[in-house]
Amino acid sequence: MKIIVAITGASGSIYGIKLYEILKKLGHDVILLASKTGIKVAKYETGMEITPDFDEDDLFAPIASGSYPFDAMVIAPCSMKTLGAIANGFSYNLITRAADVTLKERRKLILLIRETPLNLVHVQNMLKIIQAGGIIMPASPAFYTKPKTIDDMVNFIIGKILDLLGITHNLYRRWGMREDD
């Protein structure tokens, strides 16, 4: 699959970084995008320097057009600013434009939200995304898996994203499986 992974300025950049790494490891063609704030937050939270494939202001990038073939887009984490822009058709940078293209071309768009608590405007914007064909996925790890580390909790969320993309993995123990499975 050809997948766009975008990292915005919300806390939780590890989700986008880890998703990108796992998709590459599994042999998928991945395009990495990041907002300027997303790059700063990733450095602050993880100590990692991320280098996007395109600048967030490059609206001449191939992925800004519906004629460019890709299968899906995941924004992880997705800030409420980015969610609001996408929900209201405001394509002010490459991330929001690529998301707009994803929706208009009826491709899979997954927005991993981490904000809490939510206000009415956030929820209304999520409803607009769902009505437009996108998927809202809260970064809410399960605890039946008995996570022992932050990595265990991150892997659960990444695994759920891979499930939505139809990609086979073994990142977390599924409900009903024994711990030694």
Swiss-Prot record:
Q: Which reaction does it catalyse?
A: dimethylallyl phosphate + FMNH2 = prenylated FMNH2 + phosphate
Origin: domain of life: Archaea
Record-linked SUPFAM superfamilies: Homo-oligomeric flavin-containing Cys decarboxylases, HFCD
Q: What class of enzyme is it?
A: transferase
Q: Does the keyword Transport apply?
A: no
Where on this chain does FMN bind?
A: 9-11, 35, 79-82, 114
Q: What does it do?
A: Flavin prenyltransferase that catalyzes the synthesis of the prenylated FMN cofactor (prenyl-FMN) for 4-hydroxy-3-polyprenylbenzoic acid decarboxylase UbiD. The prenyltransferase is metal-independent and links a dimethylallyl moiety from dimethylallyl monophosphate (DMAP) to the flavin N5 and C6 atoms of FMN.
Query: How is this protein named in the record?
Result: Flavin prenyltransferase UbiX
**What organism is the protein native to?**
Pyrococcus horikoshii (strain ATCC 700860 / DSM 12428 / JCM 9974 / NBRC 100139 / OT-3)
